[in-house]
Amino acid sequence: MKFKKFGKALLLSALSAGIVLSVASCVQSYSVGYLYVTGTVTAQPAGNGIISGFQIDHNTGSLAPIDLLPVSSGGANPVRAVLLTGSRFLYVLNRGVNASGSADCTTANPCQNSNITVFAVGGNGVLTPQETFFTQGINPFRMIADSSGNFLYVLDHDAPSSAACALALGAGTTACGDITAFTVNQTTGRLQLIVNAQVTAANGSALTYFPVPANPVDFAEAAGNFITLSGGTPATSYPYTGGTSVFPYTFSPINGQLTINQNSSQPLGITQGTAIVYAAGVLYVLDNEPVAINFNGTQTPAQSQILPFSVGANGALAAETGGNVPDDPTLANPIYLLVESKGKFIYVVNQGNNVAGANAASGIAGYFITLTPAYQLSFIPGEPFGSGSAPQCLVEDPTDQYVYSADFNDSSVTGRLVDPNAGSLNNLRSTSTYALQGPATWCVVDGRTS
């Protein structure tokens, strides 16, 4: 059968249209996940904080607000959030406020009405509040999950009983912090308290938390251990700083129990530790050294640094061969660290001076990771990279193309495009900065979009 000229033209036109549509479909924008940001806006009922949410575009990294968000965080001053059970549930830690209504809670004037609020994550990213749970200690401020997602842990700055401190950590211990542990129900998202099987209270009853040395600053799961960064000098108000040593618990992946495996902390030779992060088999301690004290009592500005460690038996730390790594000298107050998904680059978020209008020295330091002949970190050309003022966190999107920081001082989210070869963080092809309704405190990424 032979086609007439008109028929041939019509067929070629249809084929061309099909090719065009096929090409267009290859570049069609779609969401690769959701970004959630907690914030301290108190316009919600009872002075609660909020959770904002954005869809992440796979082509540009641009963000679009999720319908029906922000929502109330379920309590005042949310500071941490964790996604679990296949990203079907979001857990938000609300610090609460003290008796005077201030967020500047201290050991003497502790936070009240602290809680963990659980949200169900809908297929379109919408959050629906479920239940509320409570820690066993006072002034909770950090929350993490184990690598399996079966257990959730909260670090309380102050344990409720000094007597239990001595029973767990040795005679003469008069004060301590604690870790409250929960089992996560993978079906309902509910939390069930884990009772301490190693230590009982002074009256012989079961202890409902795991004591850690006084003045905790941060904690992390690392190679089968839970390791707490604590300070020798009391840091009584949030955000807690001044970490000087680490203390390990052995972690059971079967029942979530934490077992003390040594009765003393390991000194790190620092005085201003701000955070501890375990990533890609290395434990990093971030150290903010604002001044060094000279032998004659004068002070010299000192550079912040990153301390990389391998984790050995019983949680003992051994410095990596390359030793301590300097932070970018133009930045200050490192508070979080991200190893990108391929293990080639490290990015350190520097909060700077967390005071609006101050010379913040905020930004992101970037490093190459060299594993051979020895573990080394070297600066990426062009760093430091921009962020908003006083970034609180840094996350990588599910496609490993973009990173986002959530910023306290200018109430924004800042997005950057990751160069997969050079490691540089570049402006997004669209808008790089997105406004929030108030100061940001933490961020998490959800890769589940249906």
PLM feature spans:
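Predominantly soluble domains enriched in secretory-pathway, periplasmic, or organellar proteins
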Residues: 25-450
